[in-house]
Amino acid sequence: MTHEEIKGKRCAIIGGKRSGIAAAKLLSRAGAYVFLSEKSVPENQATLESDLRAHGIECEFGQHSEEVFDADFAIISPGVPSSAPVIKQLERAQVPVYSEIELASWFCKAKIIAITGTDGKTTVTTLTKKIFEADGNENGYHAYALGNIGQPFSDTVESLSENDVAVIEISSFQLEHCTSFRPNVTVITNITPDHLDRYDGNIQKYAAAKYRIYQNQTASDWLIYNDDNEILHQHFTDPERRASLPMKLVALSLEKNLGDEYEHCAYKENGRLVLKLTNEKEWLIEENQISTKQFRGQHNIYNALTAAAAASALGIDKKFIEKSILSFEGVEHRLEFVRAVNQVDYINDSKATTVNALWYALDTVTPKIVLIAGGRDKGNDYTKVFSFVKEKVRAVVAIGESQEKVVQAFGNLTKVMKAFSLDEAVRLASQEAEAGDTVLLSPACASFDMFSNFETRGKLFKEAVMNL
């Protein structure tokens, strides 16, 4: 949709959190008549209403009234599921529904790198932005990390020039209502079971939402995917599908030398990372150089290689890629070293909301480990980590709604204790740990049973550790 098409249109915004508010203000500036509808009643309702109305936006809280369904089109916030009654009613009323990412893309002049996947999105987004920032400082443009990483695309899009780069982290929820969104570079880090409660327990439905990220790409665009991930490997090696995709495909692997197999690839050879996006190999750093306390482990080698491939696809010089990777200190709440107490390391991996993320944490951290796990379960199957738990974990402290499931999963493998607060969990873990051990918060679950988000869970864990 163009600016001219938006002007004078009636738009309903479903959801009044940060993305919804950013979308509402963007549309109002573009000349649309905007009505924001939020089912919950926020504590700061009066302040929020005043701010919205100052921007020419009408709003309601505590309901979705009939006015919503009189719109010419609607924008859905990422926290509102497609199965919500209000969305179903909009569809029955034949009101087009778009995501906030889709909306912002209508206004975007900058090059777009879009990153999705189950795990690794935020780290890849942050590192990719850092690489482009290094290049931009020397070549006169700006790079931005936007989207699901915390800064709505709609907040920033109007300030982006055609020379700038928008690195956008995108969830499956945000992709469900994208129709014309077209990134110059698309990245899919991996697909493992997650959010299956939103997809009828069907991982193929979840994967299909992720694949929407590349649906509008053309021959001039790039798609980077993890070929070591079984679901992605099967999807992109299907001969008929591969032949039908117009964009340049970049297969990425740490398990296989892909140099002779694919025209475009990124892989490891003789311990070094290699990019092959042209006819020539480009040798990067050795994998063992990615080994600081804050940025280490196999998963971060994948993340580094992925960010390198994304930057290389848009022509970034190797010196900026290597410099950025070597100086990268990781991202908060992702295997974040907090402190050592009595020769015990404490690591905050609150962002580990899947079993796959827990697997990488247990693979990375040296034994023995006292693990704090649990929260809101997302259909977890813990069998994948049984061998690690048996070999490396001294004890597990189970927390949250899934406490009993965690006890049942690991009770025959190691000692398991229950805690009913994060403070108690840290205290029990500290009592159980011995010199040389690591206390690891890696919940493998969502945080919403006990906390507002994983960031709050991580911050409270760090506070508890600092109080020991």
UniProtKB/Swiss-Prot annotation:
Its EC number is 6.3.2.9. GO terms for molecular function: ATP binding; UDP-N-acetylmuramoylalanine-D-glutamate ligase activity. It catalyses: UDP-N-acetyl-alpha-D-muramoyl-L-alanine + D-glutamate + ATP = UDP-N-acetyl-alpha-D-muramoyl-L-alanyl-D-glutamate + ADP + phosphate + H(+). ATP binds at G117, T118, D119, G120, K121, T122, T123. The keyword Metal-binding does not apply. Keywords: ATP-binding, Cell cycle, Cell division, Cell shape, Cell wall biogenesis/degradation, Cytoplasm, Ligase, Nucleotide-binding, Peptidoglycan synthesis. Gene3D superfamilies: Mur ligase, C-terminal domain, Mur-like, catalytic domain, NAD(P)-binding Rossmann-like Domain. Pathway: Cell wall biogenesis; peptidoglycan biosynthesis. It is found in: Cytoplasm. GO terms for cellular component: cytoplasm. Pfam families: Mur_ligase_C (PF02875), Mur_ligase_M (PF08245). One of its GO terms (biological process) is regulation of cell shape. Belongs to the MurCDEF family. Cell wall formation. Catalyzes the addition of glutamate to the nucleotide precursor UDP-N-acetylmuramoyl-L-alanine (UMA). This is UDP-N-acetylmuramoylalanine--D-glutamate ligase.
